[in-house]
Amino acid sequence: MELNKLCKLGFGMMRLPEVDDCIDIEKTKQMIDAYMNAGMNYFDTAYMYHSGKSETVIKEVLVKRYPRDAYFLVDKFPIWMNKDKDEVFKDQLERCGVEYFDLYLLHGIEDGNLDKYEKENCFEWGIQLKKEGKIKHFGMSYHGSPEVLDTILTKHPEIEIVQIQLNYIDMDNPIIQSRGQHEVLLKHNLPILIMEPVKGGTLANVSPNIESIFKQSNPNVSIASWALRYAASLENVVTVLSGMSTIEQLNDNISTFKEFKALDHEEYQVIERVTDMMKKEKLIACTSCRYCIDGCPSSINIPEIFKALNAKKLAKNDWLSEDHYSMVTQNTKASSCIKCAMCESVCPQHLHIIEFLEEAVEVFEK
């Protein structure tokens, strides 16, 4: 399949429905079927999603139930796992139950880990995997500076496609630098994949004031649809990923993309107004990717604690934020943090997690 002809909505397999801390297979099957029946077929997974269970679930809910040529499957290699890349790739094929990946990405490249990917000859490895027919296309997901991105793409023309984090609140974020990354990708004329278009749900669960602005402009569409359409309207964007957890989210997203319409001038003005308001709210820019949890020696549920903090700041259902904090910290509270900074070293958003946990202690434990 040509990369500029991928379906517009990609199914991110990192926030699947759960029951009793396990992926709900039956609900996931229902979502897969509804997505496929809508004529969409792009599935994105990774080695550590759902603590390593995402790939095996794909085998059960997708690979065993649909012909191989009916879907486009994407997986990624994470250098930070410190495992042999050939062993990881072999494990991924076995977990997913496939003989090849339609697209394989070097996962989460940034300024601080590029040298590791280079040292392990990962770019040359990708070329070899493609020659062997084990992958159809080769690319990378990226979280670094525009300058380093430009250097990588100039040095490695074998990169066919790049996945970046982009949403309307991060376009001019000095840490994320989505606008600069997008401009570099346009310079190299590469197709673009978008992750975190709704910023882990932050741009779907907005304050009442912001919600009213969106609803005044168009009362018939969801808040999330604005963020998805913003990302999908940008030049060279071929697929926008959404980590969907419910059939309701899926149906809403399908509705957004089934007869997709790019944002018009007036809608961009609404987005600009909302962006200015959101910046004043100073919410924690967590996307609930959960990378921080896997390496935390205290097993602190950092994303859920941050959800409680954000809810408190928005002053929506204030007592519910305290109740949520109590529920998600039954085993380990924010005060259990030993300040090892393991979480901060793997956070794609480069958040000052320790400081925010200290804030949670002040807000919820005093």
Where are these regions (language model features)?
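Acidic (Asp/Glu)-rich catalytic clusters
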Residues: 2-5, 36-37, 59-70, 90-99, ...
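N-terminal binding-site loop/beta-alpha segment at the start of enzyme catalytic domains
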Residues: 1-71, 125, 131
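Short catalytic-loop micro-motif centered on adjacent basic/acidic residues
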Residues: 42-49, 74-75, 136-140, 163, ...
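Active-site groove signature of glycoside hydrolases
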Residues: 93-113
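Short Fe-S-cluster ligation motifs
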Residues: 314-342, 366
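Distinct, well-ordered alpha-helical segments
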Residues: 53-64, 83-97, 115-124, 144-157
